[in-house]
Amino acid sequence: MSSSGTGSVSALVTGGTGVIGNPLVSLLRSRGYDVTVLTRRQAHGKVLSGSGVKACVGDLADVEGVRRLLISAKPNVLFHCATALAWVPSRFCARKLTPALRIWKTGTEGIVSAAVEAGVQRIVAVSSILVYPASKEAATEETPCGVSARGTFGRVVRALLEMEDWVRGAGDGNIGVVLRCGWLYGEGTFFSADGRCADLLRQRRFPILGKGEGIASFLHVEDAARAVFAAGEAPADVYNIVDDDPVASAEWVPFVADLLRADSPRQHPLWVYKPTRSPLFSHVMTRQPSVSNELARRRMKWVPVRSSWRDGFAEIWPKK
C-alpha cells in the first residue's frame, strides 16, 4: 500500500516511540503517510505532535478506548509495534513481564478486532523468532512453533503465538502480516552503545553456556523498521525478519567482548549454570536454531541493509 506523497494513506502505529516504532514513524512520514501514534505517555505525545505526527495518549489494555480511536481515525494500515522484544534478559521476571503479556494477548485481541471493525486494510504485527523450538535445522515459516519450557518463558511463547493467531485470523485471514524478528540491536536495545549487554560483558557477567551452540539471528532496528514498512504491501503471511549471518553464541559473545576491549567472557558448563534458573537464557545460548529469511527476501522484496551483525556491531562499538 503506497502513498503518492499527498498524505492519502493513513497509518496507526502502536509502540511508535519504541525501538522499531520510532524509525518506522520517520520512514512513514518521509513517504508521505499521515501517521497517528498510540502512546501511553503524555510527554511522548507532545514530542510526536511537534514532529507532524498525530499522537493519541492511551493504553492498549483499554479495549474500548482503542476501539474508539480506530473507529475515529480509520487508518488504512495498522502497524502493531508495541509487541517488539527489545531486550534479551538473563531471566524472565513474571512481574516485569505482566505488561508485555497483556499487550501480546488482550491488547492485540482488542486492537485487531477494532481494526477490522474500522475497515483497516492491512495489519502488521511484530513477533519474535523466540517462538521456534530447538533444532539443528534452520527454522523457516513452516517450522512448527512452540517450546516445552514451563513457567514464564513458556507463557511468553504462548502469548506471542496467541498474538500471531489474532493477527493472522483478522478479517478473512487475508489482511494480517506477522513478522518474526530476530534479536534486535541498535539504539534503545539490549545491544546498544549504552545498553546492558556491554555492561555485562565488561563485568564478565555474560557467560557462554555449555559449548555455546545456540544460534543467534540478529537484526538492526532500522532494518526491522524497513521490513515493517514493506509488510504494508506484502502478501498476508508470516515472515522471518533476520540478517544474513546467523552465528553461534560461542562466536558472537567473544566478538563483542573484543570490540569492547573487555576480558574474555567466562564459559560455564550447563550443570554449573543450572538451566532451570533461566530457561530463556539457556535456550538462546545453547539450543536456539538459526533462522532463514528467504521468504521475506522473495515475497516482501526485503533485504537487510546491514546484512551481518558483525558490521552492525562494529558501528555500535567501534574499536578505538
What residue spans do the PLM features occupy?
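Substrate-positioning beta->alpha
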Residues: 155-162, 189-196, 209-230, 237
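NAD(P)-dependent short-chain dehydrogenase/reductase
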Residues: 168-215
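Active-site Tyr-X1-5-Lys
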Residues: 149-176
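Conserved Rossmann-fold NAD(P)-dependent oxidoreductase catalytic core, especially the SDR/UDP-sugar
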Residues: 97-98, 106-153
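Amphipathic terminal alpha-helices
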Residues: 307-320
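Mid/C-terminal beta-alpha module of Rossmann-like enzyme folds, strongest
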Residues: 23, 225-280
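N-terminal Rossmann NAD(P)H-binding glycine-rich loop of SDR-like oxidoreductase domains
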Residues: 9-33
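NAD(P)H-binding glycine-rich loop region in Rossmannoid oxidoreductase-like domains
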Residues: 43-106
